[in-house]
């Protein structure tokens, strides 16, 4: 077996889109039961890792508003140390591009990339299933980013089934508002009883982009007018525009990259707009088996 590397640079942490998001119930502990399709896209944060012999975990980049001890990346690394007894530490640098509170899984994806990269950097060779169980302790979306491919998700988001999705390029708009997820889920007006979906309702067909809805969207639009305005603007170009996660990002799929780019080029300057291609697999999927 080859020896573990001493550094891993340019490790991507891709964003996700929820192609639909249905709230189908609520557990006794208050967690909401969901059904969704997760789509990976090529809009990414980038992380760099250097192995340390002294066991320390050092975040070498500052993230405004996120102390190192509260950073999911550091928490993920600390959890991996605790679970394995690993004596190594790491210097960790993060190039942050994905907006926080955007509904695209930025923090969860960063944590998953940390688990995948440190699993290799520290020579731990933990299987994917073990990493996913650790990831669930950090957040409900983290297991998906460790799963390695697009998925139909159930439960609180941790019960995952692989799904093949049609190629698409997405226009993603961040209306530059931060949406705290608990604020949306705790709203009395939230729909919590959407009928259950079965995966055969959308076998790898274009229908998946038009299927269902995001049950969180109506609440977010009511609370954040900028989300409603961004959706109205994007619907000029696609009837499939919808919100991802609990917001604030909205998106629409396009068959052709040139078509998507033409729309992205017109996004009003007060918002952040970009094109992002759909991915079939996580870029670091090979880091675990």
UniProtKB/Swiss-Prot annotation:
Which is a Pfam family this sequence falls into?
Answer: GHMP_kinases_N
Q: What is its EC number?
A: 2.7.1.148
Going by the entry's taxonomy, the superkingdom of the source organism is recorded as Bacteria
Q: Which residues form the active site?
A: 16, 141
Q: Which GO terms describe its biological process?
A: isopentenyl diphosphate biosynthetic process, methylerythritol 4-phosphate pathway; terpenoid biosynthetic process
* UniProt KW Protein biosynthesis keyword: no
Keywords from UniProt, A to Z, are: ATP-binding, Isoprene biosynthesis, Kinase, Nucleotide-binding, Transferase
Q: Which SUPFAM superfamilies match?
A: GHMP Kinase, C-terminal domain, Ribosomal protein S5 domain 2-like
Stored PANTHER family: 4-DIPHOSPHOCYTIDYL-2-C-METHYL-D-ERYTHRITOL KINASE, CHLOROPLASTIC
Q: What does this protein do?
A: Catalyzes the phosphorylation of the position 2 hydroxy group of 4-diphosphocytidyl-2C-methyl-D-erythritol.
According to UniProt, the name of this protein is 4-diphosphocytidyl-2-C-methyl-D-erythritol kinase
Q: Which gene encodes it?
A: ispE
